[in-house]
Amino acid sequence: MRILTLDEVPCHSWPYQSAAPRGGSQTVWFPLLRGTVDVLPDEVAALLVLSDLQGVAPHALQDGAVALLGEVLADELAILGELGELPLPGTVGVVLAGDLYSEANANVRGASGDVRAVWQAFAEHFRWVVGVAGNHDTFGGAREQVRFQQRPGIHLLDGEVVDLEGLRVGGVGGIIGNPDKAGRRGETDFLRQLDATLRETPDVLVLHQGPDVEGTRLRGSPVIRESVQRRANLLVVCGHAHWETPLATLPGGTQVLNVDSRAVLLERAKPSA
């Protein structure tokens, strides 16, 4: 899969509360960009790709009660689809690249917690949801996570590749780090999982921690870059480290779409006249 175009100006944006760098919370805006890709499954009109939804917002469908940003966005984006401003939600697949939690007051940076409600909110509206856990995501206890992963339309990946109507999506969750900490694994273990996933030739690879782009300020992992950069037909989706420019192409042809704190709607390109 190749991204052909990607708008620089958001078509929609939503205010939300996020933890401020020096304490407390701040109001920031969550943007939605639109782009096109060369190919999608016949029954899929678009992919909606998001990551790092670490905030809260009033939920209009719950009398303004504060909810996780991802829960609010799932409803708002579905409404836009029903209104005809975006593709119908039943024709849109959702890709989540992790870190979907926030404390209720949005005043703790790097808070960890249960994100099943966000996944379920997208699954209720959209065609299917696929993705990985970030280093701040939990899914209940071990048995609860197993039950969650058995829910129809939900595909939480970690070293697997799933075929979704002909689109092969692989994923590896978490980040490289101290394996004694939640959401982290040692470099050797992470790269072993990554290489095993790549051997199954996914069209889209979902990571929470993505590659860097050498010689730029686009931050990420050099060792992940070395693993993914020679795959010309691969689209890597990631978050974790925010890029001012969301799309980059590595020297070997691999495209990297960074959706930290943003959403990107990728629609099938219209045939040339």
Regions found by a protein language model. Give the residues of each.
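Active-site surface patch of divalent metal-dependent phosphodiester/phosphate bond hydrolases
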Residues: 112-128, 132
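Active-site neighborhood of phospho(di)ester-bond hydrolases with catalytic His/Asp-centered motifs
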Residues: 49-52, 93-99, 127-136, 156-158, ...
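N-terminal active-site segment of His-dependent metallophosphoesterases
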Residues: 1-117, 192-201, 206
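A general structural signal for stabilizing positions within well-ordered secondary structure
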Residues: 84-86, 120-123, 196, 227, ...
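Conserved beta-sheet core of the metallophosphoesterase superfamily
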Residues: 128-131, 145-151, 214-273
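Conserved catalytic scaffold of divalent metal-dependent phosphoesterases
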Residues: 34-40, 53-58, 102, 122, ...
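Beta-strand-turn-beta hairpins that frame and shape the catalytic cleft
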Residues: 37-48, 161-171, 204, 249-256, ...
